[in-house]
Amino acid sequence: MSSLKIATWNVNGIRAREAQVLEWIERERPDVVCLQELKSTVAQVPAALCELQGYRCYWHGARAYSGVGLHIRRDAFAEEPRFFHPPFDFETRVVAAQMDDLVVVSAYVPNGGKDFAAKMQFLRDMENYVGEVHASGARLVFCGDLNIARTERDVHPKERNPAIIGQRPEERELFEQILERGLVDVGRTLDPDNENLFTWWAPWRRMRERNIGWRLDYVLASQSLAARASQCSVYREIGTSDHAPVVAVFDVDGSTAETVTREPG
């Protein structure tokens, strides 16, 4: 394998987005697909997605709430992935897969509006897990909707308010602590000066069209992998979810890094 393509998307309802997800996967052919906010039990996932050609699929969901998926392209890795749930999983929010020394996680962090303390505990447990994976000698790619805008510039100026959940200082502090456990924010590292690198938009007042949004969706990677990242793209024009897909490419041969942020049209 000369490159590894990993994609993440909060679909905000897998049944509503079936055709869009199928078309997107067929076009992009990621080696790893991470999905969040399925709002579906495993039995409710559309059959065409359960039988995704060329992929080993794992679904983890509940009726009308939360849920994650993780799908590994069959010819991307020599060995069968081992799917599992890290100990901090609750409300069907986390699934992981291990292939040799690589661990990939698809996670949907709680919003925190109903139980902010539970969100903070989830993040603390996530920090501990990242440390444990790296202590084991494995490499980690942690993907998903983390429900935190990491810094001020990850929120459009019209939306900035440090009192709002998702922008609170204590959340951002925990985010940085997670990164200090050996992860790199791939999108921001490849595009450090982009003030419009948003992945979520409120579904009203043409916010997406005007790109007045927040950056909530991330690909975080172990330092050794992040050093080989050649692309991290936000596909703002794709789909009708309130989130956009994010796609990262890691060059196994260590090619020079560049970034692509796709705009509508």
What role is predicted for each listed range?
Residues 233-265:
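Surface polyanion/phosphate-binding segment centered on an Asp-His-Pro turn
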Residues 73-74, 97-100, 222-223, 241, ...:
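Active-site beta-strand termini and strand-to-loop segments that position acidic
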Residues 6-10, 25-43, 104, 130-152, ...:
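Active-site beta-strand/loop signature of hydrolases that rely on acidic residues for catalysis
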Residues 1-52, 56, 63-68, 256-265:
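N-terminal, active-site-proximal structural segment of metallo-dependent hydrolase catalytic domains
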Residues 38-41, 45-110:
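Structured beta-strand-rich core segments of catalytic domains in phosphoester-bond hydrolases
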Residues 84-85, 108-123, 159-164:
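Surface-exposed cleft-lining segments at the edges of enzyme active sites
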Residues 53-54, 124-212, 216, 262-263:
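Metal-dependent phosphoesterases centered on the DNase I-like endonuclease/exonuclease/phosphatase
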Residues 64-79, 204-227:
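Conserved beta strand-loop-helix elements of the APE1-like EEP
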